[in-house]
Amino acid sequence: MLIDMLKGKIHRATVTQADLEYVGSITIDETLMEASGILEYEKVQIADVNNGARFETYVIAGPRDSGVICLNGATARCASVGDKVIIMNYAQFEPEEAKHAKPYVVLVDDENRLTKRVRYEKHGLLAEEL
């Protein structure tokens, strides 16, 4: 049996663009992708902090250090430019592996520049908070 577990997330990024006419997906700054462990074309779940919507799509790499968070295609209807979003990816683990999984948390400023990369520890606390 495999268990779906959080692998990493980009916390409270700001949506910078929305392109309804694009084929689909979310474009994410490549620096943020690498820091959170998100791969190009990987499925992600997005939670809009402003309106509570949750939706899934796949990722396209955006220019490194550009701060881009662009909702493409139908996902452009799920959040507005300026909204804060949480972008999460998941992995499947065997139960014993899952007990020791510690997801990456990528924190950004209002321009989506990486400010900190930490791991979750016990009880949802970040490593630095223990």
UniProtKB/Swiss-Prot annotation:
Provide the cofactor note recorded for this chain's UniProt entry. Binds 1 pyruvoyl group covalently per subunit.
Q: Which domain of life is it from?
A: Bacteria
Keyword Ligase assigned: no
Which co-factor is required?
pyruvate
Any GO BP: pantothenate biosynthetic process
The principal location of this protein is: cytoplasm
Which top-level enzyme class is recorded in the Swiss-Prot or TrEMBL entry? lyase
Protein name, as recorded: Aspartate 1-decarboxylase
The species is Lactiplantibacillus plantarum (strain ATCC BAA-793 / NCIMB 8826 / WCFS1) (Lactobacillus plantarum)
Q: Which gene encodes it?
A: panD
